[in-house]
């Protein structure tokens, strides 16, 4: 099967094009740093495989995710490259395009965001550009799919009759050095003359990953040649001279290809940015937007729908299943397992799907509109005080959906200590798995202020992440503040198709989790409540679950929720935070009173909020722990990521409850 890779700058629509060409769905967002690892999809019409590589401005990697690109181009086998560029930022995008052309591999250029360029009054004669580069160019609008069908039909012809032809003349002295380097590379390695020239150029540009691919003897020889030509060029260094020549080439190339308008048509966008990123009013606007989202999720739309679903699952559906099982003569043990274990456990989580869908819809809307990137800029000013940059806030925002991709997104951070700090604090972000716990308790104890209470938990998670990062960056992970540079994407009206796909995929993942982790956890919890030291079908107060819960309940007694039932729910919470709710449903369904009534009797508003604080901050779920181990390559950091949140959760919850208990 033929392999093709898709490359481009961050936030030019690579993943949108990947989805359009493969029919799959990968997470997309109107901001940079969404793709942090290689993703593979099967092209439609069985054309081959498409590899989506992380966005990069240059083939000299400065962050962990960018090393994936250079490593793939040097070491993997592929039939051709699809370089997607932003038509509204063509000059800047051509920096990477030129480097890819210097590979002298079959390449197509996808001219994306033609619609954005047109709205700005930018005119591009892509036919003329195609003739100049001798490379096929396809205008597309990846987010709507316009032009992608034509591109898909042509991909199978990529490379047919291809002849290497691209070459920039870097001047006599540098070209002589490149020639000498090529001879060394071809003699000492298996690279052909085109690969050798590419390697030589990248070596002169101080691409350290290229140097790492070569043996020390070759590196020493090439370094000697680079040092010699460094002294010969008039510029500060050979790298600066080559960059100057390359920039001149691009300017000449685009001179009669791109026509810009006389006046700036982004004036309105700039005015909005001055308000949304204002150092005084920007943050209140963000908090107001988040309050509005939570108000819609928990009061206006989400909760009423969840109540209807809860009534259906707990009533009509459960009664129907019982009737069918009685008719079929299913043994009592299985009947109890299915109704009191599986339906009660999984159903108690599924009832929150409407709220999850509403929340995901609005988060996707903020992402696709371009607003989230502005929040990263806004937070950069604040995060400097805590030893981080705005680039760390991007993974943190992703953590509102799930902590696992947020930890992986930290690859885009160049500074290794800042990357590690971000990984360690990311689990404090309120992921969707915690949302059912919040929804259950705020619906019982804080009906009049549900949105404010949930917002306070999200804000608390961010504050605790900042405080911990301050400690880490001043002690074991001390580092200099990094400069945060981010490209603010164009504001755009969110695509209904994109919003639907994004919301659907996230909700589907939540439901899929209910069918795996939560299903398994519910079965185990029910069995532990069914079996005890004295046999099976015992009273729950004599079960193994009661024994485990009593031990942990004793430990959390000072936190305000020291019942054995609450203690028993904390252990499976390590598997997945949603299992906490399913465990409660199973444990409390063993009695005659309903879940809501029992929780009202065992918790107070104070202890309920304390419980939510503990759930917010304590041990990350097993998937998150696995992601931390994968990204840090260290059991030491992984152990720290498990232990310190538990200690933090215990101490903060203790302080909150004990002080609150003095006044309530």
Curated annotation (Swiss-Prot):
Please provide an example of a Pfam family that matches this protein in its UniProt record. FeoB_N
Q: Where does GTP bind?
A: 112-115, 141-143
Q: How does it sit in the membrane?
A: Multi-pass membrane protein
- Classify the main location: membrane
Q: Does the keyword Ubl conjugation apply?
A: no
Query: Which part of the chain is the FeoB-type G domain?
Result: 1-161
Which residues does the record give as GTP 1 binding sites? 8-15
Q: Which cysteines are joined by disulfide bonds?
A: none
Positions annotated to bind GTP 2: 33-37
The molecular function GO annotations come to: ferrous iron transmembrane transporter activity; GTP binding
Q: Where are the transmembrane segments?
A: 281-301, 342-362, 382-402, 425-445, 452-472, 516-536, 544-564, 567-587, 608-628, 637-657
Record key words, sorted:
Cell membrane, GTP-binding, Ion transport, Iron, Iron transport, Membrane, Nucleotide-binding, Transmembrane, Transmembrane helix, Transport
What Gene Ontology terms describe where this protein resides (cellular component)? plasma membrane
Where found, per UniProt?
A: Cell membrane
Residues the record lists as binding GTP 3 = 52-55
Q: Does the keyword Zinc apply?
A: no
Task: Quote the function comment for this protein.
Answer: Probable transporter of a GTP-driven Fe(2+) uptake system.
Q: Which family does it belong to?
A: Belongs to the TRAFAC class TrmE-Era-EngA-EngB-Septin-like GTPase superfamily. FeoB GTPase (TC 9.A.8) family.
- Report the protein name in the record: Fe(2+) transporter FeoB
Its taxonomic placement starts with: Bacteria, Bacillati, Bacillota, Bacilli, Bacillales
What would be the name of the gene that encodes this protein? feoB
């Amino acid at each position: 099967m033929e392999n093709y890779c898709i490359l481009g700058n961050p936030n030019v629509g690579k993943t949108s094009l990947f989805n359009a060409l493969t029919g799959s769905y990968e997470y997309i967002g109107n901001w940079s740093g969404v793709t942090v690892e290689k993703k593979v999809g099967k092209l439609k019409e069985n054309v081959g495989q498409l590899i989506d590589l992380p966005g990069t401005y240059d083939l000299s990697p400065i962050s962990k995710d960018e090393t994936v690109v250079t490593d793939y181009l040097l070491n993997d086998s592929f039939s051709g490259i699809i370089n997607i560029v932003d038509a509204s930022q063509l000059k800047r995008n051509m920096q990477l395009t030129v480097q890819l052309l210097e590979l002298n591999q079959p390449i197509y250029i996808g001219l994306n965001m033609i619609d954005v360029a047109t709205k700005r009054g930018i005119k591009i004669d892509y036919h003329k550009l195609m003739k100049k580069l001798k490379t096929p160019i396809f205008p597309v609008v990846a987010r709507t799919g316009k032009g992608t069908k034509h591109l898909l039909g042509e991909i199978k012809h990529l490379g047919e009759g291809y002849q290497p032809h691209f070459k920039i003349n870097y001047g006599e002295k540098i070209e002589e050095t490149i020639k000498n380097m090529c001879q060394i590379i071809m003699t000492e390695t298996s690279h052909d003359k085109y690969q050798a020239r590419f390697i030589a150029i990248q070596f002169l540009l101080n691409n350290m990953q290229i140097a790492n691919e070569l043996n020390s003897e070759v590196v020493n020889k090439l370094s000697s040649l680079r040092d010699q030509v460094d002294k010969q060029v008039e510029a500060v260094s050979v790298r600066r001279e080559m960059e100057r020549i390359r920039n001149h080439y691009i300017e000449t190339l685009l001179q009669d290809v791109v026509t810009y308008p006389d006046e700036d048509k982004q004036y309105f966008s700039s005015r909005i940015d001055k308000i949304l990123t204002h150092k005084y009013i920007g943050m209140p606007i963000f908090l107001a937007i988040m309050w509005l989202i939570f108000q819609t999720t928990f009061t206006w739309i989400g909760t009423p729908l969840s109540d209807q679903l809860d009534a259906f699952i707990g009533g009509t559906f459960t009664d129907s299943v019982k009737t069918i099982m009685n008719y079929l003569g299913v043994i009592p043990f299985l009947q109890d397992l299915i109704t009191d274990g599986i339906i009660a456990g999984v159903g108690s989580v599924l009832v929150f799907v409407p709220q999850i869908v509403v929340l995901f819809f609005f988060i996707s809307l903020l992402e696709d509109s371009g607003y989230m990137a502005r929040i990263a800029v806004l937070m950069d000013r604040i995060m400097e005080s805590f030893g981080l940059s705005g680039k760390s806030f991007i993974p943190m925002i992703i953590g509102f959906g799930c902590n696992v991709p947020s930890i992986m997104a930290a690859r885009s951070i160049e500074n290794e200590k800042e990357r590690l700090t971000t990984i360690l604090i990311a689990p404090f972000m309120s992921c969707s798995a915690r949302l059912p716990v919040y929804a259950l308790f705020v619906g019982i104890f804080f009906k009049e202020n549900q949105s404010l209470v949930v917002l306070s938990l999200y804000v608390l998670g961010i504050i605790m992440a900042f405080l911990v990062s301050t400690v880490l960056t001043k002690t074991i992970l001390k580092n200099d503040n990094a400069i945060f540079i981010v490209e603010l994407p164009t504001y755009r009206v969110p695509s209904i198709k994109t919003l639907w796909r994004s919301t659907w995929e996230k909700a589907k993942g939540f439901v899929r989790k209910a069918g795996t982790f939560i299903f398994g956890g519910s079965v185990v919890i029910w069995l532990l409540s069914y079996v005890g030291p004295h046999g099976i079908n015992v009273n729950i107060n004599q079960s193994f679950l009661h024994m485990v819960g009593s031990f942990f309940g004793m430990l959390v007694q000072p936190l305000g929720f020291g019942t054995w039932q609450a203690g028993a729910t904390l252990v499976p919470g390590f598997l997945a935070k949603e299992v906490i709710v399913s465990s409660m449903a199973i444990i409390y369904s063993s009695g005659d009173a309903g879940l809501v009534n029992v929780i009202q009797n065992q918790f107070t508003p104070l202890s309920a909020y304390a419980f939510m604080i503990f759930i917010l901050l304590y041990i990350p779920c097993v998937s998150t722990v696995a992601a931390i181990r994968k990204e840090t390559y260290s059991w030491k950091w992984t152990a720290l990521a498990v232990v310190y949140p538990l200690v933090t959760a215990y101490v903060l919850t203790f302080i909150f409850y004990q002080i609150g208990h003095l006044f309530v």
